[in-house]
């Protein structure tokens, strides 16, 4: 499975592609960070990120895009910009019919380090080790993008099993409710 991991941000947006194999085998394909100047209008910055996402998707042809979920930050403005950057990447993937999955920072940290509270240095060190890289990806946004892709490769089978279980439970509930309605209807005759 080829996964494009994206660490969204207005100033620096990390992109990382890995190929996931059997078990926990992952192979690095590409990594980079797209930068946008703070003095540009927001719309221009988002356009640059969107164009970069489209280019990465067209070049690397991922089966899925994994984006960091923004849920809380102390600086509301930063959180909004990060969410907007993630949104334009999700839109670029959706336009190409590519599924998008969101992972929280703690999910990503736990997947690659074993601890949901790991710091950036620990995440970078483990990404370097897992992917057998000669040097650590820099800046941290690049390592985070690769970590997101790794996380998704490792969590995808579980996510798929959960989706199948939820679908089966919903079908079972539908059948039960239909049978219950039949019994009630028969009892009122």
From Swiss-Prot:
List where this protein forms a coiled coil. Answer: none
Q: Tell me which species this is from.
A: Rhodococcus opacus (strain B4)
Subcellular locations according to the entry: Cytoplasm
**Assigned EC number:** 3.1.21.10
Assembly and binders:
Homodimer which binds Holliday junction (HJ) DNA. The HJ becomes 2-fold symmetrical on binding to RuvC with unstacked arms; it has a different conformation from HJ DNA in complex with RuvA. In the full resolvosome a probable DNA-RuvA(4)-RuvB(12)-RuvC(2) complex forms which resolves the HJ.
Residue positions binding Mg(2+) 2: 68
**Mind listing the UniProt keywords for this protein, alphabetically?**
Cytoplasm, DNA damage, DNA recombination, DNA repair, DNA-binding, Endonuclease, Hydrolase, Magnesium, Metal-binding, Nuclease
A Pfam cross-reference name: RuvC
User: Which processes are annotated in GO (biological process)?
Assistant: DNA recombination; DNA repair
List the lineage, top down: Bacteria, Bacillati, Actinomycetota, Actinomycetes, Mycobacteriales
Q: Name the InterPro entries on file.
A: RNaseH-like_sf, RNaseH_sf, X-over_junc_endoDNase_Mg_BS, X-over_junc_endoDNase_RuvC
Q: How is the cofactor bound?
A: Binds 2 Mg(2+) ion per subunit.
> What gene codes for this chain?
ruvC
Quick one: a GO cellular component term? cytoplasm
Describe the family membership recorded for this protein in Swiss-Prot or TrEMBL.
Answer: Belongs to the RuvC family.
Q: Which residues form the active site?
A: 7, 68, 141
Protein's name in the database: Crossover junction endodeoxyribonuclease RuvC
Enumerate the residues binding Mg(2+) 1.
Answer: 7, 141
* Top-level taxon of origin: Bacteria
Reaction(s) catalyzed by this protein? Answer: Endonucleolytic cleavage at a junction such as a reciprocal single-stranded crossover between two homologous DNA duplexes (Holliday junction)
Stated role:
The RuvA-RuvB-RuvC complex processes Holliday junction (HJ) DNA during genetic recombination and DNA repair. Endonuclease that resolves HJ intermediates. Cleaves cruciform DNA by making single-stranded nicks across the HJ at symmetrical positions within the homologous arms, yielding a 5'-phosphate and a 3'-hydroxyl group; requires a central core of homology in the junction. The consensus cleavage sequence is 5'-(A/T)TT(C/G)-3'. Cleavage occurs on the 3'-side of the TT dinucleotide at the point of strand exchange.
């Amino acid at each position: 499975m080829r996964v494009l991991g994206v660490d969204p941000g207005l100033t620096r947006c990390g992109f990382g592609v890995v190929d996931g194999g059997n078990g926990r085998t992952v192979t690095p394909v590409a990594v980079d960070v797209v930068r946008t100047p703070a003095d540009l209008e927001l719309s221009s910055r988002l356009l640059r990120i969107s164009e970069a996402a489209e280019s990465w998707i067209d070049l690397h042809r991922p089966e899925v895009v994994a984006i960091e979920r923004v849920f809380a930050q102390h600086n509301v403005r930063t959180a909004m910009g990060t969410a907007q950057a993630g949104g334009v990447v999700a839109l670029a993937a959706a336009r190409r019919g590519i599924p998008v999955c969101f992972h929280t920072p703690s999910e990503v940290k736990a997947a690659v380090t074993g601890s949901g509270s790991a710091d950036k240095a620990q995440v970078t060190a483990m990404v370097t080790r897992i992917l057998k890289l000669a040097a650590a990806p820099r800046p941290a946004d690049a390592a985070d993008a690769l970590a997101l892709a790794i996380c998704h490769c490792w969590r995808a089978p579980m996510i798929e099993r959960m989706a199948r279980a939820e679908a089966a439970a919903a079908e079972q509930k539908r059948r039960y409710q239909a049978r219950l309605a039949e019994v009630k209807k028969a009892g009122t005759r």
